[in-house]
């Protein structure tokens, strides 16, 4: 099952943000400053780390750190 810390690790790596800014309620674009390319790279990083495939439709719904954790948990 995806843990917050595992997802956080990918976010810090892909977005280059400070780990302390990555909270469950943090929004990728508004709070963490991700642009569209970084968002795609983040989704790909999560797919690689957790061995899942995230459809474009689902990716558009994943806007917060907690949403990513919940989505990954539902796919494992």
From Swiss-Prot:
One GO MF term attached to the UniProt entry: acyl carrier activity
Name the UniProt record assigns to this protein: Acyl carrier protein
Domain Carrier positions: 1-76
PROSITE patterns membership: CARRIER (PS50075), PHOSPHOPANTETHEINE (PS00012)
Main localisation: cytoplasm
PTM: 4'-phosphopantetheine is transferred from CoA to a specific serine of apo-ACP by AcpS. This modification is essential for activity because fatty acids are bound in thioester linkage to the sulfhydryl of the prosthetic group.
One biological process term in Gene Ontology: lipid A biosynthetic process
Cellular compartments annotated: Cytoplasm
PANTHER family: ACYL CARRIER PROTEIN, CARRIER DOMAIN-CONTAINING PROTEIN
O-(pantetheine 4'-phosphoryl)serine: residues bearing it: 36
Pathway linked to the protein: Lipid metabolism; fatty acid biosynthesis
Protein keywords: Cytoplasm, Fatty acid biosynthesis, Fatty acid metabolism, Lipid biosynthesis, Lipid metabolism, Phosphopantetheine, Phosphoprotein
Top-level lineage group: Bacteria
GO cellular component, as recorded: cytosol; membrane
UniProt xrefs under Gene3D superfamilies: ACP-like
Job of this protein: Carrier of the growing fatty acid chain in fatty acid biosynthesis.
Pfam families in the record: PP-binding
Stated family: Belongs to the acyl carrier protein (ACP) family.
């Amino acid at each position: 099952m995806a843990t917050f810390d595992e997802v956080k690790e990918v976010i810090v790596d892909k977005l280059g943000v400070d780990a302390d800014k990555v909270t469950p309620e943090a929004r990728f674009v508004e709070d963490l400053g991700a642009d569209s390319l970084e968002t795609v790279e983040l989704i790909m990083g999560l797919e690689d780390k957790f061995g899942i495939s995230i459809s474009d439709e689902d990716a558009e719904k994943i806007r917060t750190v907690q949403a990513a954790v919940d989505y990954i948990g539902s796919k494992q």
